[in-house]
A protein has these predicted regions:
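A short, well-structured juxtamembrane/interface segment
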Residues: 108-112
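Conserved polymerase palm-domain catalytic core
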Residues: 38, 44-46, 97-98, 103, ...
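PAPS/PAP-binding and catalytic site of the sulfotransferase fold
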Residues: 82-86, 142
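Short, conserved non-catalytic motifs in the polymerase core
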Residues: 21-29, 54-80, 94-106, 126, ...
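Short helix-capping/linker segments at secondary-structure and domain boundaries
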Residues: 88-94
Length: 174
């Protein structure tokens, strides 16, 4: 049900998830000043399918190496959390047990502890960073996976908006 998926209550949950660890950021603070009206505006835009991702924030980090980061504005991050809340339970059922990246109650430290139990104590491992990982994801293949496993036109629409959004076309340098 579209009104349920994009409801104020679901957006409020997504907002609370999104602001964890982000409350001190400028875009989060601006959003929080009028968060109820911002969420109502988002609800209306999503239900009417008038939602458009806003500007991104572009900045460089140097640790562990120099790299360019394209971050979504806080308002768009709320929408991302809304979409993840719908997709996550579907993907969780398909993942193998020993897949640890970006999963609730898992993560790199838990993966290392598990690996230490499974193999010899003289353990070596590699933690790698794939250059331009998110930029090189095949967006059409990703969207096809969603279409294959999700039977909800509203989710298709929102996923397409987010996946095919190009942050380099509308950004604020920082």
């Amino acid at each position: 049900n579209v009104s349920m998926m994009f409801s104020f209550q679901n957006l409020l949950k997504a907002y609370y998830q999104c602001r964890k660890g982000k409350r001190k950021t400028t875009s989060a603070a601006k959003f929080e000043i009028n968060f109820e009206s911002e969420l109502l505006k988002l609800e209306k835009e999503l239900i009417s399918r008038n939602y458009q991702p806003g500007h991104s924030i572009c900045f460089a980090i140097t640790d562990p190496k120099l790299r360019e980061v394209w971050a979504a504005d806080f308002r768009d991050r709320v929408v991302h959390h809304l979409l993840v809340s719908y997709l996550e339970p579907i993907w969780e059922k398909m993942f193998v047990f020993h897949s640890y990246a970006c999963r609730q109650t898992k993560g790199a430290h838990k993966a290392i502890r598990c690996l230490k139990k499974i193999i010899a104590p003289d353990l070596f491992f590699l933690q790698a960073d794939i250059q331009s990982f998110f930029v090189t994801i095949d967006k059409s293949a990703l969207f096809s996976l969603i279409k294959k496993h999700v039977n909800n036109p509203e989710i298709f629409w929102l996923a397409e908006k987010i996946i095919f959004h190009d942050p380099t076309t509308n950004y604020i340098p920082r």
